[in-house]
Swiss-Prot record:
Annotated spans, Mediates interaction with CTNND1: 276-312
Residue(s) at site: Stabilizes the active site histidine for nucleophilic attack: 256
Statement: the UniProt record of this protein carries the keyword tRNA processing: no
Species of origin: Mus musculus (Mouse)
Name of this chain's protein: Phospholipid phosphatase 3
Control of this protein's activity: Magnesium-independent phospholipid phosphatase. Insensitive to N-ethylmaleimide.
Locations listed in the record: Cell membrane; Basolateral cell membrane; Endoplasmic reticulum membrane; Endoplasmic reticulum-Golgi intermediate compartment membrane
Family recorded in the similarity comment: Belongs to the PA-phosphatase related phosphoesterase family.
Free-text tissue specificity from the UniProt record: Detected in lung, cerebellum and heart atrium.
Glycosylation sites: 171
Side Cytoplasmic, residues: 1-33, 107-123, 216-226, 280-312
Topological relation to the membrane, as annotated: Multi-pass membrane protein
One GO MF term: phosphatidate phosphatase activity
Length: 312
């Protein structure tokens, strides 16, 4: 009768007599975690650095000339804005972060999904990753926008109203006018040179499209099939309305808004698919190696098997 022996894979013991998983130094793990958080914050700061420098310094946009008969820059200056900067930032950031907080809470505590992080609280780890990716995308989008504004210096539709050049000193027969002096307030004149591309369009498209993709990945409830598409449609319409309002307010040309939409959508897709883990395949927990079965033959069986081979 044959007997079998099963060999099990044994975890190598550490110097302290236990397994490595049980002998990790908590202080070492905590310091490593703090170091990684500091590295993330440094990357976030570097992504936002161009935006911070341009907004807080006296960097002036490129000084572009104009044509006297250019009707696209002769619109009046509207004092009030349909959607000002404060409303744009508040709505875009608050809605996105609230949606992420709710979505990650539902995923961790209701769906019981696990996090790969070593943090004891998986909800905090998931929230840190998703909010961090969103803010990183915001920083990149705004830095791209401000770099384009100061580098290109396209004139806004209300430029001549703000600049108020002295046409008595300008010879319009020369065609493209480069030598001119603005009599308007300098800060408003410099702002009127930042038409391309629309910051409202790029920021609103990034935040809303990021939320659309977040809902696509996290909103898994199948009770109402049209609820998720309705929410996604609403978010995109909010972004489109924000961009189109800039044309109605004479702040941007239509091409500025289209370029802003394209930039915001591109950054949102890159952040979602290449930085975050929203659409990455979930890996199952690794199973232990199967037991190895070894056949042990008795002396009689060995003799019989040898005789069989000799006869062959």
């Amino acid at each position: 009768m044959q007997s079998y022996k099963y060999d099990k894979a044994i975890v190598p013991e550490s110097k302290n007599g236990g397994s490595p998983a049980l002998n990790n130094n908590p202080r070492k793990g905590g310091s490593k975690r703090v170091l990684l958080i500091c590295l993330d914050l440094f990357c976030l700061f570097m992504a936002a650095l161009p935006f911070l420098i341009i907004e807080t310094s006296t960097i002036k946009p490129y000084r572009r000339g104009f044509y006297c008969n250019d009707e696209s820059i002769k619109y009046p200056l509207k004092v009030s804005e349909t959607i000002n900067d404060a409303v744009l930032c508040a709505v875009g950031i608050v809605i996105a972060i609230l949606a992420i907080i709710t979505g990650e809470f539902y995923r961790i505590y209701y769906l019981k999904e696990k996090s790969r992080s070593t943090t004891q609280n998986p909800y905090v780890a998931a929230l840190y990753k998703q909010v961090g990716c969103f803010l990183f995308g915001c920083a990149i989008s705004q830095s791209f926008t401000d770099i384009a504004k100061v580098s290109i210096g396209r004139l806004r539709p209300h430029f001549l109203s703000v600049c108020d050049p002295d046409f008595s000193q300008i010879n319009c027969s020369e065609g493209y006018i480069q030598n001119y002096r603005c009599r308007g307030e300098d800060s408003k004149v410099q702002e009127a040179r930042k038409s391309f591309f629309s910051g409202h369009a790029s920021f609103s498209m990034f935040t809303m499209l990021y939320l659309v993709l977040y809902l696509q990945a996290r909103f898994t409830w199948r009770g109402a099939r049209l609820l998720r598409p309705l929410l996604q449609f609403t978010l995109l319409m909010m972004a489109f309305y924000t961009g189109l309002s800039r044309v109605s307010d004479y702040k941007h040309h239509p091409s500025d808004v289209l370029a802003g939409f394209a930039q915001g959508a591109l950054v949102a897709c890159c952040i979602v698919f290449f930085v975050s883990d929203l659409f990455k395949t979930k890996t199952s927990l690794s199973l232990p190696a199967p037991a190895i079965r070894r056949e042990i033959l008795s002396p009689v069986d060995i003799i019989d098997r040898n005789n069989h081979h000799n006869m062959v």
